[in-house]
């Protein structure tokens, strides 16, 4: 609080006191006293402020002079330090420059010495090269002279040889070339024989390993199917009931099933004979149901035959599903599964086609695994390779082509379709899976006991083998042995030599392969 304010407040307090003590003072006196006090307070305040400001200004000026003096002294000190540092830096730079200059002079001198040494070495090499060139030129001239002498000598000897032999050089060359051609031809034939024999041995060894391993892991226990089936009867009296009055029961059963019922003197047995296994199976089931039921008459026979047909259809579907389950082949179309089931009632040379297809699927998958391939496609193609046999009595054409068309219709992959079509050579192989399926098919078919062959067909096959062998020029005699698995040929030595016999064997093998269908390897 300033002095004027204190005086003003003191005056107010004084007046208030006076007013309380003497109420008789008038208002004018109060106002005049207040103004006087206020003027005095303002003047005193102004005087005090002026003295205080002057003191502050004086102090500030003194501080400013001190600061300026300090700054001048500090600037002078900094200036001296900067001059000293600059002198030191100049001295250091001068030393560095002198050192670097000295190093560069030394390096230049070293390079100059190396250049001088290289120039001296190059001069020496140049002198040596000049000497070598002179020596080579001299030797070249000597060789040219010797070459000229040799050519002259060769010409004289050639003329002397032509005179003595009575042949020109061209005639002699032709004779020599002819001899060389014969020798090269013979050596080429022997080399081809050696290479091909070695390649066949290696291929046969590897193929035997793969097929042996596959066969060892795939043991089939089924036997050849027959075209007849024997139904056991509880007693011989049942034969008369099956025949019926005037033979109407047996005629009805034969008409509805298409199967021949043979009732002879065989005790307690009826023979069902039919080439269609599906019809034979329908007749068997129907007859067994009739025997169990005991009521045998045309109406009942018709009813049982219908039930048997439905049961066979169910069995066909179940057999197809079981085949896919056994071989782990999934995702087949329902129609393909049904066709697979129908193969159970088809045979090929007495071999059950469904069992054969399962066996081929196993073998193809195992061989694919041995080759480091994914066995899935090989097993799928092997299972479906004979699918055409389930429909080939309805559609004309080879069963391989029919099967390929069926597989294609039900969206099988191109690899599977080609494997089916090519497994009998009707189309070219487009994949390794197709080759494996053909090999597995041949293994399954050639397995001992898998298929039957009639005596007449066997004899004709042996005669055809010997006929093909005897048709070649130079063959004296031929023998088909080992059940037609080996063909031994005796040739005339004056007509066929060793190399020619090898070529004859190759051509004969191709002829047999083209003209005969073989399930085994022929030696």
UniProtKB/Swiss-Prot annotation:
Superkingdom classification of source: Bacteria
HD domain mapped to chain residues: 353-446
UniProt keywords, alphabetically: Cell membrane, Endonuclease, Hydrolase, Membrane, Nuclease, RNA-binding, Transmembrane, Transmembrane helix
SMART domains per record: HDc, KH
UniProt membrane topology term: Single-pass membrane protein
MF terms (GO), sorted A to Z: RNA binding; RNA endonuclease activity
Gene3D superfamilies per record: Hypothetical protein af1432, K Homology domain, type 1
Cellular component, GO, one term: plasma membrane
GO biological process, any: mRNA catabolic process
Family statement: Belongs to the RNase Y family.
Descriptive protein name: Ribonuclease Y
Protein species of origin: Clostridium tetani (strain Massachusetts / E88)
Gene designation: rny
């Amino acid at each position: 609080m300033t002095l004027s304010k204190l005086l003003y407040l003191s005056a107010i307090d004084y007046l208030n006191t006076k007013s309380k003590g003497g109420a008789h003072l008038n208002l004018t006196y109060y106002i005049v006293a207040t103004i006087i006090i206020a003027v005095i307070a303002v003047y005193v305040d102004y005087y005090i402020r002026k003295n205080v400001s002057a003191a502050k200004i004086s102090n500030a000026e003194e501080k400013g002079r001190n600061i300026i003096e300090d700054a001048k002294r500090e600037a002078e000190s900094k200036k001296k330090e900067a001059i000293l540092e600059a002198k030191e830096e100049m001295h250091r730079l001068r030393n560095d420059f002198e050192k670097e200059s000295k190093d560069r002079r030394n390096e230049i001198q070293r390079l100059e010495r190396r250049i001088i040494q290289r120039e001296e070495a190059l001069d020496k090499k140049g002198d040596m090269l000049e000497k070598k060139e002179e020596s080579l030129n001299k030797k070249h001239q000597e060789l040219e002279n010797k070459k000229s002498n040799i050519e002259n000598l060769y010409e004289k000897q050639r003329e002397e040889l032509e005179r003595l032999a009575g042949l020109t050089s061209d005639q002699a060359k032709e004779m020599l070339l002819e001899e060389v051609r014969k020798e090269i031809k013979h050596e080429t034939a022997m080399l081809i024989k050696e290479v091909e024999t070695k390649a066949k041995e290696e291929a046969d060894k590897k193929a035997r390993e793969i097929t042996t391993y596959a066969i060892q892991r795939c043991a089939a226990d089924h036997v050849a199917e027959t075209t007849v089936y024997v139904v056991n009867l509880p007693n011989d009296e049942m034969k008369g009931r099956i025949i019926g009055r005037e033979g109407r029961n047996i005629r009805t059963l034969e008409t509805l099933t298409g199967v021949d019922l043979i009732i002879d003197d065989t005790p307690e047995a009826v023979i069902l004979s039919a080439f269609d296994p599906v019809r034979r199976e329908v007749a068997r089931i129907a007859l067994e149901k009739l025997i169990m039921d005991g009521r045998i008459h045309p109406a009942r026979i018709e009813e049982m035959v219908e039930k048997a047909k439905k049961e066979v259809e169910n069995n066909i579907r179940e057999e197809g599903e079981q085949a896919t389950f056994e071989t782990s082949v999934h995702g087949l179309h329902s129609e393909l599964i049904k066709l697979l089931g129908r193969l159970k009632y088809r045979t090929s040379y007495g071999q059950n086609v469904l069992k054969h297809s399962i066996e081929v699927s196993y073998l193809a998958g195992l061989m694919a695994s041995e080759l480091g391939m994914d066995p899935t496609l090989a097993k799928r193609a092997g299972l479906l390779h004979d699918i055409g046999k389930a429909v080939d009595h309805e559609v004309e054409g080879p069963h391989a082509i029919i099967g390929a068309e069926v597989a294609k219709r039900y969206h099988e992959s191109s690899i599977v379709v080609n494997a089916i079509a090519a497994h009998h050579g009707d189309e070219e192989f487009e994949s390794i899976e197709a080759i494996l399926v053909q090999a597995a098919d041949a293994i399954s078919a050639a397995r001992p006991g898998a298929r039957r062959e009639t005596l007449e067909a066997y004899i004709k096959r042996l005669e055809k083998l010997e006929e093909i062998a005897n048709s070649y020029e130079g063959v004296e005699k031929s023998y088909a042995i080992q059940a037609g698995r080996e063909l031994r040929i005796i040739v005339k030595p004056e007509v066929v030599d060793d190399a020619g016999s090898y070529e004859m064997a190759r051509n004969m093998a191709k002829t047999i392969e083209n003209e005969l269908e073989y399930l085994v390897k022929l030696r």
